[in-house]
Amino acid sequence: MSKFDLSALETFVRTIPQHYKGPGGAVAVLKDGKVVLRHAWGFADLSTRKAMTPETRMPICSVSKQFTCAVLLDSVGEPEVLDDALAAYLDKFAEKRPSVRDLCNNQSGLRDYWALTVLCGADPEGVFLPEQAQSLLRRLKTTHFAPGTHYSYCNGNFRILADLIEQHTGRSLIELLSERIFQPAGMKTAELIPDTALFDECTGYEGDTVRGFLPAVNRIHWMGDAGICASLDDMIAWEQFIDATRDDESGIYRRLSGLQTFSDGAAAPYGLGLKFEETGGKRLTGHGGALRGWRCQRWHCADERLSTIAMFNFEGGASDVAFKLMNIALGVPTSEQVRVAADAVWFGSWLDHETGLVLSLEDAGRGRMKARFGTGPEMMDVVGENEARSSMTAIRRDGDTIHLAREDENLSLTMQRLKGAAKQDIAGHYRSDELEADLLIVDEGGAFYGAFEGFLGKSDMYSLYEAGPDVWLLPVQRSMDAPSPGEWKLVFHRDAKGEITGMTVGCWLARHVDYRRIQE
């Protein structure tokens, strides 16, 4: 690590309100367990003119997951202790069940339950109760990949963990977090508040400077996967606790941040509620958080005893800020990727037949392409005539085939170019037996729309757009959780006579959900 440059950090922090436009936020940097930068700006509530301060509590969203796993290790023991309880929880499974460690490492193969709420007809701003979460999770019978083989983000993993921990200990997660984690770490105001509608100390905002900023509505009951509210000072205390216990091999963060692997022995990018990253040759551990109106990110570099924290009450780039703060603190130089012009043969849609996932590519200018594959668009640098990559994805084109690799996910796909037009006979009623949910597709004046129906209600109508023969895209930009599932990929199946018999519906968070056509 080069010499620590506090002035460079301070210079960057002064630019945050201009480059990340929104109501307010708070950031901190720690070195050797001491706070070297602690700053808040803007407003916790625009209408009441309540200022944002380091003491202002905000939802830390999915950053909560590491604390759930910390309670597991501290009050239960190793994840394997709960494997039998998980088997009883997922009692409808028709194939190999994941282990509790698979849940902790996001290798379970379970489809994300927030994505599945869309298929079950949920209102994005509706109430979601604990019993509804259990009803959805306990009806699952399949995974979208064999447990332990790949990485896929799944909030439901941690919701199940919370249920299992409470069942095993006979105590609430609220009590366990306070007693086992927050009090020992000196996180004086941190608290699990499961019902997001009850939190009113700070307002989270949707929107931007073009549309304006409006208070975001959240009426979800969280447990295990999110729900903790904490101030910047609480998060600073967590980083100081991590540093103070750094040499204790039995210390909770040492145990949380250990290396994890996939079933084939390959290194995994995630474990026990922590994301693993690397910058400047240094290993980082941390996590991001997102809920409608909120963004949060923390990173810790054990080798250099460095930590960075960013918390926003708007949907801005807190993850980007925390990572840039870490790079500045480490003295990692910035470099511009050398790019070549993107040939038009890249552009269009590409299908992986096994997973039903679609990669859509379009020109973004200056040697870049905008790719849609996961939960949101990612910018890809074209680094050669037939090669492009982003921070998450590498693709190589060979004629009408793209080889896609996401090394962190242990995922390799072979995708074929979609050519030709889609048949216009998709209107009908489709049923997912596993979810006990329906998808209704209608033709209204030559335009197709789809609506989801299930135990959570009936959704609005969503537009459908053809991507190629028997492949359609159904964008969903608002859901209960953030980010939304993005584009649902609908891949239709036909019999020997050419009649549609069913389809698979999927997105990166929830792949290959089978639907059969109901003849009416």
Curated annotation (Swiss-Prot):
GO biological process: proteolysis
InterPro entries in alphabetical order: Bact_CellWall_Synth/Modif (IPR050491), Beta-lactam-related (IPR001466), Beta-lactam/transpept-like (IPR012338), D_amino_pept/lipop_sf (IPR027279), DAP (IPR023645), DAP_B_dom (IPR012856)
Annotated spans, Important for specificity: 477-487
Reactions catalysed: Release of an N-terminal D-amino acid from a peptide, Xaa-|-Yaa-, in which Xaa is preferably D-Ala, D-Ser or D-Thr. D-amino acid amides and methyl esters also are hydrolyzed, as is glycine amide
Activity regulation details: Inhibited by beta-lactam compounds such as 6-aminopenicillic acid, 7-aminocephalosporanic acid, benzylpenicillin and ampicillin. Inhibited by p-chloromercuribenzoate.
Gene3D superfamilies: 2.40.128.50, DD-peptidase/beta-lactamase superfamily (3.40.710.10)
Sample GO molecular function, one term: aminopeptidase activity
EC identifiers of the protein: 3.4.11.19
Active site per UniProt: S62, K65
Enzyme type, top EC level: hydrolase
Keywords noted in UniProt: Aminopeptidase, Hydrolase, Protease
Top-level taxon of the source organism: Bacteria
Binding site for substrate: D481
Regions crossing the membrane: none
Subunit comment: Homodimer.
Family: Belongs to the peptidase S12 family.
UniProt function note: Hydrolyzes N-terminal residues in D-amino acid-containing peptides.
HAMAP family attached to this UniProt entry: D_aminopeptidase
Entry protein name: D-aminopeptidase
